[in-house]
Amino acid sequence: MLEPICASEALAERGKAVVWDVMQWGRPARAFALRFDGQVVAYLNRCAHVPTELDWQPGEFLDDSRQWILCSIHGAAYHPADGRCVGGPCGRGRLTPLEVGEADGRVHWYPTKELQPAFPD
């Protein structure tokens, strides 16, 4: 089952992310999608270091250079392409990915047993 996220044009290259509500193992959580090097990537909005949301402003996840996803609390840095920690207190951690796709001008994600829509139809 595909779940819509947004129109493709809503995700500018290395721009602001789209954030939406999900359920992780039955508990409320947030996820985000952004475009990096032409690909749409999506992750659970939770730092691998401390379970807190990453964005420093709504939808703003990338650092000033627009190269890294940066945690607003402790500065943990993650590579946008694969979510792996590249610096800071996240050690060998990584962000939890969501499988996403893009077709016909729309971005969508594939729910899993772990991550489900917050508001199913």
Where are these regions (language model features)?
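N-terminal pre-ligand scaffold of iron-sulfur
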Residues: 1-65, 79-80, 94-121
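Short cysteine clusters
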Residues: 47, 71-74
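Short cysteine/histidine-rich metal-coordination sites, predominantly Zn2+-binding motifs
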Residues: 61-71, 85-93
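Short beta-strand His + acidic residue motifs that chelate non-heme Fe in jelly-roll/DSBH
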Residues: 78-79, 87
